[in-house]
């Protein structure tokens, strides 16, 4: 089951000019629509509170309906809920929808998957100026590669507060390269770089563990990264059910998905080697 919401960016222009009663601007205003798809996922996890309790205290605690209300059950449920969210976050970039799959990575299309799809459709490209070809990023060239990439962004994007989403290894290489390059320059007071050098503190570096092995880096605004969940009403539940005297079922159904609000050059610049090769040097041969 799929939930869909149309999002997008309004395009058009309007300008004041010298007073002229006869001048009328008839250029239209349009919306470039994009569809945020959320997919219904489900999981049933059977567990035994008594088994968990016995590993610590060596005795049983309860049975029947009372199992649902003991502290150890609440602790296990809190743990499972947190793991559910953590596993979705772990594949937020790399997930690829596979209806016959059983894992979080099969539930929805992540941002890297969407990026590759749009590249293959020529909607993200150098010609459209929302893509820039980069070299593999190593500790010897990271500063130059990221600065060149940032300077290739549209002027509108560059004057906006942006985030540069990169693998953790790319950030490590950037810090090492920065230290080796300007380590003794007086104005350098810290090697922990939060913003990209020469971006006037407009480009925040965002290293992500869930982008490991990625073929892309993304320069965009936080508001352009849409994550959809909820609003499934009666189809969405997180609950505990008891169908066995000593065991409980953790049952969860929810919608989840991701999308860019727009892929226009004013809001997004993608850096890649060839759309497939990991951007971090030394990965993938």
PLM features: residue spans?
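Assembly/oligomerization interface modules of large self-assembling protein complexes
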Residues: 1-58
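Sequence/fold signature of self-assembling virion shell proteins
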Residues: 1-4, 10, 108-140, 171-285
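Helix N-cap / beta->alpha transition motif
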Residues: 46-53, 57, 166-170, 220-221, ...
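Short helix/loop capping segments that flank catalytic or ligand/cofactor-binding pockets
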Residues: 55, 89, 173-175
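Alpha-helical scaffold segments that mediate packing/assembly in large oligomeric complexes
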Residues: 58-145
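Amphipathic interfacial helices
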Residues: 146-147, 151, 155, 162-164
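Long, repeat-rich segments with strong aromatic
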Residues: 160-169, 173-175
């Amino acid at each position: 089951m799929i939930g869909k919401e149309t999002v997008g960016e309004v395009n058009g222009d309007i300008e004041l000019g010298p007073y002229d009663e006869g001048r009328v601007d008839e250029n239209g205003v349009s919306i470039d629509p994009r569809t945020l798809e959320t997919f219904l996922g489900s999981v049933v996890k059977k567990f035994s509170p008594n088994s968990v309790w016995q590993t610590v205290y060596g005795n049983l605690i309860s049975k029947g309906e009372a199992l649902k209300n003991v502290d150890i059950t609440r602790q296990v449920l809190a743990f499972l809920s947190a793991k559910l969210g953590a596993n979705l976050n772990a594949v937020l970039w790399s997930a690829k929808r596979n209806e016959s799959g059983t894992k979080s990575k099969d539930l929805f299309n992540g941002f890297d998957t969407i990026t590759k799809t749009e590249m293959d459709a020529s909607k993200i490209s150098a010609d459209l100026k929302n893509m820039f070809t980069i070299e593999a990023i190593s500790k010897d060239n990271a500063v130059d590669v990221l600065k060149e990439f940032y300077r290739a962004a549209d002027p509108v994007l560059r004057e906006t507060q942006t985030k540069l989403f990169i693998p953790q290894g790319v950030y490590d290489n950037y810090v090492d390269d920065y230290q080796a390059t300007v380590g003794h320059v007086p104005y350098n007071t810290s090697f922990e770089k939060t913003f990209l050098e020469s971006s006037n503190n407009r480009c925040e570096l965002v290293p992500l563990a869930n982008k490991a092995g990625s073929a892309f880096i993304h320069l965009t605004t936080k508001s352009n990264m849409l994550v959809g969940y909820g609003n499934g009403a009666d189809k969405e539940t997180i609950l505990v059910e008891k169908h066995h005297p000593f065991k409980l079922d953790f049952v969860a159904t929810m919608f989840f998905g991701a999308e860019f609000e727009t892929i226009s050059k004013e809001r997004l610049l993608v850096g890649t080697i060839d759309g497939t090769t990991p951007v971090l040097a030394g990965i993938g041969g």
